[in-house]
Amino acid sequence: KGSSGSPTPPIAAAPTAPPPQPKAPEIALPPPAAPPPVVIQPTPAPSNSPVLADDPTIKSLSEKLDKNPDDAAALYRRGQVYASKGAYDLAVKDFTNSLRLNPKDVEAYNNRCWVRTVIGDLQAALKDCNEALRLRPNFVDALDSRGLMNLKGGQNKNAIADFDAALKINPRLTSSLYGRGLAKQRNGAVAEGDLDIANAKAMDPNIVKEFADYGVQ
């Protein structure tokens, strides 16, 4: 029974274990900022520059732009390809340069509005969508983009108004139908929202994932 004193030495070792723990919270904090760009990417896994540079469309457009940096159409097209591959910052840069050369390009304003909405730059997105709609009133794509921007910003009534206007022009616009469903649910009209969502899913089963990629669920 004299061995009862032996449990005490291990206790001395215990204090050495806790010190590493304070570092864990620091490591846990940065990740939340990183996931969005990854989640947003549609199909291609990593959208790192080597992969983008190898894309044949981007390659040929970049070669075109090397010869003529003021080719607004090539900048716009490359911006579209970047956006489709989840390289949103590069897309914004190309749309901005394209608009510098062609300040009345409604499509470029709408595309930059949409990309800025996806990355959460909502104030700038609103300006772009409003400019697109000033240049081309009732432009269905810009109404759809602004609806998404309002939905992300929690402006559900404005989102419903934008999606309503878009659906009046194109009743089969799945993104507006699904977006309106979410906005209606959040605004308290749950049954109406459910109906819009069910109809949108029947038209395009991928719409749920698409919106999740935009940061909207």
What are these regions (language model features)?
Residues 185-217:
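Terminal, low-structured helical/coil segments at or just beyond the last alpha-helical repeat
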Residues 64, 97-98, 131-132, 165-166, ...:
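Canonical positions in the second alpha-helix
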Residues 84, 118-119, 152-153, 186:
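Register position in tetratricopeptide repeats
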